[in-house]
A protein has these predicted regions:
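Conserved nucleotidyltransferase catalytic core and NTase-mimicking acidic/glycine-rich helix/loop elements
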Residues: 177
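Long, contiguous, compositionally biased segments that the model treats as domain-scale units
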Residues: 2-172
């Protein structure tokens, strides 16, 4: 991470992020870290305390659609595929993107994952957590893409957390008028 600029450096925060237990992200490139869904299950961060349930609720809906599907390509299957739309979430700066734009899941990879999920459902499993294991049964799906998927589902929670931390640190348009804050 040559020439990496950390949030703490950019805003001259000293050790405030560490004191608050906040990740000191690199702002000009991705940090090689990922969202760990199992940590979300146990988090005490208020804004993220329901994120794990939100993720499972989303995938439970996908599983219900696949259960109701009679064959690959029918209406219920297509609806599951339509909902399984995960472009990368820009701005959280996690993963391995060199361009700063996260890849997420493309159409072909989404079709493959939903096709495999359909086969798993038809074999008898309807647990939404199966999507947390997608990297084990699908090529080209590693922690980076899984993290993008999770970030897409909990984006609002991440934004709310960021707003609270920004408020605690007085990071806003008043103190930094040259920056647009979310």
């Amino acid at each position: 991470m040559e020439n990496a600029v950390f949030v703490s450096e950019f805003f001259n925060l000293g050790d405030e992020l560490e004191r608050l237990g906040v990740f000191d992200a690199v702002i000009n490139t991705d940090s090689p870290f990922f969202i760990n869904v199992l940590r979300l299950k146990q988090t005490t961060v208020p804004e993220l305390s329901h994120s794990y349930e939100k993720i499972n609720a989303f995938f439970s809906d996908i599983m219900r659609l696949l259960c109701a599907s009679q064959e690959k390509g029918d209406r219920m299957y297509r609806e599951a595929l339509r909902r399984f739309d995960f472009s990368g979430v820009n701005g959280i700066n996690l993963g391995f993107s060199e361009s700063g734009v996260d890849a997420g899941f493309g159409r072909i990879l989404s079709q493959k994952v939903i096709g495999d999920a359909y086969d798993i459902v038809k074999a008898g499993s309807t647990q939404p957590e199966i999507f947390q294991l997608v990297g084990l049964f699908e090529e080209n799906v590693a922690a980076d893409r899984l993290s993008d998927m999770i970030a897409t589902l909990i984006k609002e929670d991440i934004i709310n957390y960021t707003r609270r931390i920004n408020e605690q640190l007085s990071l806003n348009e008043s103190t930094y008028p040259q920056i647009t804050f979310v």
